[in-house]
Amino acid sequence: MVRNWCSLIRPRRIEIDESTHTRFYGEFVCQPLERGFGITLGNALRRVLLSSIQGAAIVSVKIDNVLHEFSTVPGVKEDITDIILNLKGVRLKLLSDGPRVIRIDTKKEGVITAADIITDGTVEVLNEDHYIASLSGDMPFRMEMVVNSGRGYVQAKKEKDVDQPEGTINIDALYSPIKKVNYTVTHARVGQIADYDKLSLEVWTDGNVLPEDAVAFAAKILKKQLQVFVGLHTVIGTEEVEEEEEGEAVSEKENLNDILLRHVEDLELSVRSANCLKNAGINLIGELVQKSEAEMLKTKNFGRKSLSEIKEILAEYGLTFGMKLEFTPWNKDVREEMGEIQEEG
């Protein structure tokens, strides 16, 4: 049984659009992918991002002299249901384990915003200009809120906990720090083949988590969930395992040969690094990996930045500089086969 995933092309790196990247937005481009994998990965990442990234939210509130959500507060423009609705829009970052208590204690006339929230230093308010309520007079207004961490959307508890003080109102919690996720799939080219996928993923957050961290967390969640399926091959018989291991060894060797025979342009290096390799006469990946780092640094215009770039990309293929190879994929016969050298007339 041959391990059929060996020959699938894998994306080399993730590109981030630095011109539009902020704490709240990021666009990530992943290529090349096998045809169909753009939608497969894009949809999976989108669903996990929207449902499973941990955030913080207000889960309950207690307002002085208020016993239930249908009450009103003298001197406050909004009724309690409106205040609760506004509290759901307060975006918070929990800097330690929850739950934590935050509060508002004011008697100034005018607008109350999230900036008026008093914390103990373990909770950060992300949208301080968010509107909560308005006071029409110099009336004292005191409110305590409990903040906790969680995932997704959780409905308010219908029954109060025994340790909750009288007048506590549980509210629905929108924990997710992800506001929106879009993805598009277009064609990508590798060498002369343009039948691959390019996945572009856009992520909007509330600032609780950086977009790139959110994508990384989503990928780790998917990896953990899929890990159990990887072990399914252990249930087959001993004889099949031996055959599979032998097949895997052959497959891995063939796969390595394929990589070494590919042109260095397939690595999609920066223009500077690509020109350095071209000027040094390094055309195939097999030629590149046999060079030592010291040799590469002696190449004209080739610096440590280019070295780091190439090392990172080679590592994704399980390759490195200074490899000792049992064959020479850069000989004349192979180059003729690859179209590198034209036959002499």
From Swiss-Prot:
Q: Which reaction does it catalyse?
A: RNA(n) + a ribonucleoside 5'-triphosphate = RNA(n+1) + diphosphate
Record EC number: 2.7.7.6
Q: Where are the residues of the annotated region Alpha C-terminal domain (alpha-CTD)? A: 256-345
- According to the record, the residues making up region (Alpha N-terminal domain (alpha-NTD)) are 1-233
Print the keywords alphabetically.
Answer: DNA-directed RNA polymerase, Nucleotidyltransferase, Transcription, Transferase
Q: Does the keyword Cytoplasm apply?
A: no
Q: Which GO terms describe its biological process?
A: DNA-templated transcription
Q: What does this protein do?
A: DNA-dependent RNA polymerase catalyzes the transcription of DNA into RNA using the four ribonucleoside triphosphates as substrates.
* Domain topic, free-text comment: The N-terminal domain is essential for RNAP assembly and basal transcription, whereas the C-terminal domain is involved in interaction with transcriptional regulators and with upstream promoter elements.
Assembly, in brief, is: Homodimer. The RNAP catalytic core consists of 2 alpha, 1 beta, 1 beta' and 1 omega subunit. When a sigma factor is associated with the core the holoenzyme is formed, which can initiate transcription.
Q: Mind telling me what this protein is named?
A: DNA-directed RNA polymerase subunit alpha
Starting at the broadest rank, the lineage of the source organism is: Bacteria, Pseudomonadati, Thermodesulfobacteriota, Syntrophia, Syntrophales
